[in-house]
């Protein structure tokens, strides 16, 4: 009898999966987000495959960082944004209780208000805004910027999250100041000694947005730089998950906002390098030589055991993407340290309108923690210490 019941339940599950595939497009259905074998939390978060070419990375989950991979091997991590937050008076109230509660997925201003309240600790009173500044700064027209932002907010509201690159945007040939306009779409993979992937630097914010958008050309999903609110949501996501594991709230908040030395590539950090290559910074000048992680240089910034040593001043090392497993949280590599990352957030400063976030590897982890907001002189060209990260949504 138990066996018969088990077979019945198996049949029901298979039928449910078949129906889901037909409805959600995993076997040629429509363009709605696909869910298939991805875990979810009812009423809170519903991860989806951007399209049928993605698959789940084995062994990953919502508790430790759910990862998917596209057909080219690029990997993305799900950022949870609980759908229940919009009904919480702590987040939906401005003057009277619930006056900022969204009425639908297109109630964009109220959705954004709630997300700002939810991430208030990481906004930290910033005057930066997710508003259009110029075509030259963002790589988008005003209409395109507004449309993109609304689509992001709508998707987050409906699905309870979004995807970001597991790794910093990467490229197979290291860029230098003398390189011309970048044209190659970014990767989101871990580099190795044999196949190094370098942080995609010497790009402007507008170029980074244009490059990122190439990943979804002709696709049914969108690819973009993150807006400022998305970066803050990534930090909040890490906070919530770490607290759920028993980490004290104060401890994780400090690691995200005050001092990220313990989990990022900074000059005052020490950690084991597991793969890839590195280049030495000396007095904020980056070497043109990239050394395998298991070898040393005359500077001895990395010892014979592949352990990065503590540096001072403006010395340090720049890593290829995903080089150290100690420089990650929730399966997201190098959110703290290595290179700063462009966002579509505006500083409203005519000389430096584009906000970038995170740390820099020849500086300390308390000066440039993961939370850090700063700016780049976008109009003057790219820098060796500023890159970007891809966001996917549907």
Where are these predicted regions, by residue range?
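Short aromatic-cysteine micro-motif
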Residues: 72-73, 104-334
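A signal for long, low-complexity, Ser/Thr/Asn-enriched, surface-exposed stalk/shaft
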Residues: 1-31
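Acidic glycine-/aspartate-rich tracts in secreted/extracellular proteins
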Residues: 82-86, 168-171, 344-350, 361, ...
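GGW-centered surface loops in extracellular recognition modules
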Residues: 29-89
């Amino acid at each position: 009898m138990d066996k018969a019941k088990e077979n019945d339940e198996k049949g029901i599950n298979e039928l449910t999966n078949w129906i889901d595939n037909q409805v959600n497009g995993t076997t040629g259905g429509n363009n709605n987000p696909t869910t298939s074998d991805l875990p979810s939390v009812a009423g809170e978060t519903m991860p989806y495959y951007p399209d049928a070419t993605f698959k789940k990375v084995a062994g990953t989950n919502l508790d430790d960082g759910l990862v998917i991979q596209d057909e080219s091997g690029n990997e993305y991590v799900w950022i949870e944004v609980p759908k229940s937050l919009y009904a919480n008076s702590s987040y939906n109230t401005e003057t009277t209780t619930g006056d900022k509660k969204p009425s639908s997925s297109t109630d964009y201003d109220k959705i954004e208000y709630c997300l700002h309240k939810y991430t208030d600790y990481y906004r930290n009173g910033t005057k930066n805004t997710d508003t259009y500044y110029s075509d030259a700064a963002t790589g988008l027209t005003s209409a395109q910027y507004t449309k993109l932002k609304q689509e992001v907010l709508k998707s987050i509201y409906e699905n309870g999250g979004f995807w970001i690159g597991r790794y910093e945007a990467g490229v197979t040939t290291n860029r230098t100041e003398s390189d011309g306009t970048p044209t190659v779409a970014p990767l989101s993979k871990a580099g190795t000694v044999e196949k190094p992937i370098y942080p995609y630097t010497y790009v402007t914010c507008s170029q980074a947005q244009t490059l990122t958008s190439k990943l979804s050309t002709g696709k049914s999903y969108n690819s973009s730089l993150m807006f400022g609110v998305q970066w803050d949501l990534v930090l909040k996501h890490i906070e919530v998950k770490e607290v759920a594991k028993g980490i004290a709230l104060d401890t994780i908040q400090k690691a995200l906002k005050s001092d990220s030395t313990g989990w990022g590539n900074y000059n005052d950090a020490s950690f084991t390098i597991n793969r890839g290559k590195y280049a030495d910074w000396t007095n904020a000048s980056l070497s043109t030589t990239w050394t395998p992680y298991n070898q040393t240089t005359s500077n001895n910034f990395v010892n014979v055991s592949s352990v990065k040593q503590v540096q001072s001043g403006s010395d340090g090392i720049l890593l290829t993407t995903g080089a150290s497993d100690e420089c990650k949280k929730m399966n997201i590599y190098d959110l703290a340290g290595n290179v700063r990352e462009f966002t579509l957030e505006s500083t409203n400063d005519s000389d430096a309108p584009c906000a970038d976030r995170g740390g820099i590897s020849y500086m300390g982890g308390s000066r440039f923690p993961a939370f850090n907001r700063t700016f780049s002189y976008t109009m003057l060209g790219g820098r060796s210490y500023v890159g970007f990260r891809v966001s996917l949504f549907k």
